[in-house]
Amino acid sequence: MIREWQVLTTERMEPALNMAIDEALIGFVGRGEVAPTLRFYSWEPRGLSVGHFQRATKDIDRNRIEALGIPIVRRMTGGRAVLHADELTYSVILPEQMEGVPKTVIESYRMLTEGIRKGYHHLGIPVEFSVPMTEEEKEELRKPKSAVCFDAASYYELAVGKRKVAGSAQVRHQGVVLQHGSVPLSVDEGELFDCFLYEDETMRERMKARFAGKAVALNELAGRSVSFEEVRLAFVKGFEDALQLTFRPLEFNSTQWQEIERLAEKYRSEEWNWKR
């Protein structure tokens, strides 16, 4: 495995630009322009990302999110919707054929998520891998009851007890692995569930109550307010420990920024975000 990676931090960027950078990095890494990359980012304004195959018109209350000023963006990765507000988001981009990268999605997911797990441990939070054990848990993954990502933990996601602490997804494209994930520092459950369509308010309240037992934010686990920078530094250390890595900073050149801006237009478009 390549032991020297690059690290990139891009704070307070719009949703379309955040997704464009992740997609652009697939090309940059695939062409050998940059080394395998660990990226940390945040969102301004807050945004709602939906999974690549998710039916946004079926799940998302468009009128409500527009009234709240929450833009939507469709990810390259699968899974369900995530409201990105007070959080740290991470992404990892590396060649699929790089030595040491498992061939299966589940095992590579476990390898990369180990860096996040160790990062939580550096913050004093004993998170562990979640593996669905019961038939009920496995059925819940096959047929989700909710459009909300944090409603259930998949294989090798991170949890404290039965409560999910981070939501991640992975895709392989053009010979490159992209895994990105949301690490909420706090969650506004009222606003989160306002984003989705339900048959009635009773169902909305029922799903909100269910969510409280299925997910937990970092500040609640830490018992204090944890900053983006503190989490970022802990996760860098976590990846250094988990994969025996060193990091050097990544800065894009003007040509790379032009490619990112071109991709961002797709992520701002009605066609990409809603008509799929």
From Swiss-Prot:
EC number of the protein: 2.3.1.181
Keyword terms of this UniProt record: Acyltransferase, Transferase
Subunit structure: Monomer.
HAMAP family: LipM (MF_02118)
Location of the BPL/LPL catalytic domain: 32-247
Protein name, UniProt field: Octanoyltransferase LipM
Keyword Transferase attached: yes
Protein's GO biological process: lipoate biosynthetic process; protein modification process
Molecular function per GO: lipoyl(octanoyl) transferase activity
PANTHER family: OCTANOYL-[GCVH]:PROTEIN N-OCTANOYLTRANSFERASE (PTHR43679:SF2), OCTANOYLTRANSFERASE LIPM-RELATED (PTHR43679)
Pfam families: LplA-B_cat (PF21948)
Recorded family membership: Belongs to the octanoyltransferase LipM family.
Keyword Transferase: yes
Anything else known: In the reaction, the free carboxyl group of octanoic acid is attached via an amide linkage to the epsilon-amino group of a specific lysine residue of lipoyl domains of lipoate-dependent enzymes. The reaction proceeds via an octanoyl-thioester enzyme intermediate.
Active site as annotated: C149
Pathway annotation from the record: Protein modification; protein lipoylation via endogenous pathway; protein N(6)-(lipoyl)lysine from octanoyl-[acyl-carrier-protein]
Site (Lowers pKa of active site Cys): K164
Function description: Catalyzes the transfer of endogenously produced octanoic acid from octanoyl-acyl-carrier-protein onto the lipoyl domain of GcvH, an intermediate carrier during protein lipoylation.
Gene for this chain: lipM
Enzyme type, top EC level: transferase
Reaction(s) this enzyme catalyzes, per UniProt: octanoyl-[ACP] + L-lysyl-[protein] = N(6)-octanoyl-L-lysyl-[protein] + holo-[ACP] + H(+)
PROSITE patterns for the chain: BPL_LPL_CATALYTIC
